[in-house]
UniProtKB/Swiss-Prot annotation:
Family: In the N-terminal section; belongs to the methyltransferase superfamily. tRNA (mnm(5)s(2)U34)-methyltransferase family. In the C-terminal section; belongs to the DAO family.
Function per UniProt: Catalyzes the last two steps in the biosynthesis of 5-methylaminomethyl-2-thiouridine (mnm(5)s(2)U) at the wobble position (U34) in tRNA. Catalyzes the FAD-dependent demodification of cmnm(5)s(2)U34 to nm(5)s(2)U34, followed by the transfer of a methyl group from S-adenosyl-L-methionine to nm(5)s(2)U34, to form mnm(5)s(2)U34.
Source species taxonomy: Bacteria, Pseudomonadati, Pseudomonadota, Betaproteobacteria, Burkholderiales
The keyword Cell division is annotated on this UniProt entry: no
Sequence segments annotated as region (FAD-dependent cmnm(5)s(2)U34 oxidoreductase): 255-637
Molecular function terms from GO: flavin adenine dinucleotide binding; oxidoreductase activity, acting on the CH-NH group of donors; tRNA (5-methylaminomethyl-2-thiouridylate)(34)-methyltransferase activity
Protein name from the UniProt record: tRNA 5-methylaminomethyl-2-thiouridine biosynthesis bifunctional protein MnmC
InterPro entries tied to this protein: FAD-dep_OxRdtase, FAD/NAD-bd_sf, MnmC-like_methylTransf, SAM-dependent_MTases_sf, tRNA_MAMT_biosynth_bifunc_MnmC, tRNA_MNMC2, tRNA_S-uridine_synth_MnmC_C
Gene assigned in the entry: mnmC
Amino acid sequence: MPERIEWLEDGTPYSPRFGDRYRSESGGLDQAREVFLKGCGLPAAWAGQPQWCVLETGFGLGLNFLVTWQAWKTDPLRPRLLHFVSTEAFPASAADVLRSVQVHPELLPLARQLHDQLWGLLPGFHRLVFEEGRVMLTLCIGDAKAMLREQSFEADSVYLDGFNPGLKPADSPDIWDLHTFKAVARCCRRGTRVATWTVARSVRDALAQCGFVVKKTPGIPPKRDNLQGEFNPAWEPKKSMLPGIRRQAGSCVVIGAGLAGAAVAASLARRGWRVVVLDAADAPARGASGLPAGVLAPHVSPDDSLLSRLSRSGVRATLQQAHALLDAGTDWNPTGVLEHCVDHARKLPAAWQSDWAEAAQDWTCLATSGQLAHCRLPASAPALWHVRAGWIKPASLVQAWLTTPGVEFHDHASVGQLIRQPDSWQVLDANGHVLACAELVVLAAGYASRALAEAAVPPTSPPLALQAIRGQVSWALHPPGAADALPAFPVNGHGSLIPALPLSGNANELAWVTGSTFERDNALNDLKPEDDSHNLDRLRTLLPDVAPGLTGQLEMGQVKAWAGVRCATPSRLPALGPLAAPNLWVCSGMGSRGLTFAALCAELLAARLHAEPLPLEQRLAEALRPQYGEAKLVSED
């Protein structure tokens, strides 16, 4: 459940858990500006910088974030990117966050945007994106110490906020103790500024032990003092604790113009890179990303597995991009998705039905009898309802990403060889003609990435563990009366059905799409009539009372097909990371979840290149490292 907040007669939010106000008696806005922003030398300190990272312990009601965002927005010398990383063990509801800002009307436009993204805050990291990707809030839900151990970046400013250190309940984590400050120090560079409102001796001593040099400064009446300082340890931090070096934006060649490649190109271009995207086809999204439409929905498992957690981060990232770039109803539709658990009943994690029930219901819950009836399924059918889900046309998302300023697309550019120069790469075609040169190359060409990587890395390096998987979907225009006979939302679980896909931007010309087949070790995209029969057979299992109204179209020759070749890894997780050659990366292996993972992987790649805060926990990010050897797929469940 969201943290319970009581509202005092003067409108001040109060925490029953901590027995303390969320704001200082002098006013939260003054404290945010004077104690934290000014205490860290902002906005002057970030002038002219490519990026700036603020770390906060204690998100509370988000006021410090909103004030920092406002300062960035109104500063002509602002950095290109503002990262704000905040930990919070007891997240408040979106409604309370918005209510708390009513007394500060100048912040309301920003607060409404924040409110709209404050959903589904289960334990872990949540990347919220504003200002077309230039302001990024990474909310880390959980104990500050544990959350910061999952991060890897250098903060430029640190806000130490929270309730009075003397009021901590016995069952709550302590964000003012030595171990928390050690975790904070691990995320600091020499010279990182720190600010807080408390001058408690225990806090000053703990900060000093962790390498912070602090001093008292005049406070806001009635408070006499605040605390300011900087990270300047008398020792050199261990190299193993240091994140990567913040590199400057440069030139990049991305090979492959599908979801993975276009997402990488857009993420790098937003950071100032000059990106050339090469593809052998005559247009973008001619490979697996040319699918007429795909279902976007999270994976669910009773133990909240690695794949489940990664899929939620990916779905959130894709939804943000779709809302910003695509036309709802034409390019995509967030209708929600019903998962009919045909093969076995999927159980929700136990915590989703108790402590985190409200946040979990923003993601997935048991399907209602009404939703089942809409699919002509019995009320006893095992099914889930994915709230933040729907269908997307992958090609539309690819096209939108490739229009990002700084991205240049070249078609008919078949890459034959990569040649390493002293400080760059030459990308050549099969005849040895130079297609492009850049300091960084990202392989995002699906299964073809394996051969390109093998030719570019030292011969002793093992091959990438990538497997080609052919898939075919079947589709047809709606027969008469189909609108009333079909569900209003996609259904998945044993194959899938997208019931109402507008074609060519015409909302009145609708088609249904079902599939897909799954043929391993086949890199050919030829169409097979027997695959259409297979897809319709699976649809009979998925939706027994809906399928008969569509299968007749197969007999009348009205069903059409599309086939493509996906690329997967043994773990069924994407392959993202550097290869055994300088400035050569791979972003591939997303299987049937390109829509889920492309945007997330692109942001993770950019974060690693620029030593930015990670968009997901370190242990999840590490699971995406490229795998090598033979590609033998494992089960998802």
